[in-house]
Amino acid sequence: LRGFFKGLLIPLAAATLLAQSDEVPLFKADSRLVVLHASVVDRKGKLLTDLPENAFKVYENGAEQNIKVFRREDVPVSIGMVIDNSGSMRDKRAKVERASLDLVKASNPQDEVFIVNFNDEAYLDVEFTNDMRLLEQGIARIDSRGGTALRDSISMSIDYLKEKGKKDKKVLLVITDGNDTASNDRDTLEKLVDKAQKSEVLIFAVGLLSEEEPHEAKKAKRVLNSLATASGGLAYYPKELAEVDEIALRVAHEIRNQYIIAYTPTNPALDGTFRQIHVTVKGPGSPVVRTRTGYYATAAGARETKAASARMP
């Protein structure tokens, strides 16, 4: 499978919100919905998972929207593990591998996972599977050498996730220890953020940057923070390598405890413009909500689906 990603260009088609055959359908009928996966934490960073619908308000370009669907549910996810395999990761890989496996073990049993190891190029070492044996083999495929093609690897992983992922909710976990040194100039950070927003992929990142030169660490943080913030994920920067396992378990827990919020935009035009999304929440502990910051008003960004009204339990 090595070299699979070279030259991979996959058009982003309109996604469907129809549930998979082994899932309870979320929606039915005909409508156009913008679907958000939202995390809520209190001032101490603890996830709040039992807030009512009336605690939330959703705004698009400043205009309040009517929430059509609201629920908190542990839905199966398509997950991509994008792991830095450059030369500087050689002494860090063992702990990163263990943390990656612990995340998978703590995830929904119906999740599907693929693994990309990257250095100067990206390698698809394991296609989508929930076979733990295959995942262990892929994560343990150590060949730490070369540079860090961070942007290229994330871009290609988004393409693969959108083309092959069978679950409606899609997540990338990126683990790296340095700034990009090998990506081409085609995928600038701005273009990559646009792609992430158009693809509706949640991006979580772990930056092992404590040993990086301050200037290089700052550039790496800009990439990881921009992608995580725009997509509704979060970037972590542990001071010690030993913290990685705890972070991986925290990410797995968050993915399984997000709110699903959907609305039909008051502005129905599919004019290709970017629509800013802002969600507020009220509750104990001064809660803060995190979700994607917007979408492009196209068939891919605000999904034309055959699903509209919630099929509530």
Regions found by a protein language model. Name each.
Residues 19-313:
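Scaffold/interface architecture of coatomer-like assemblies
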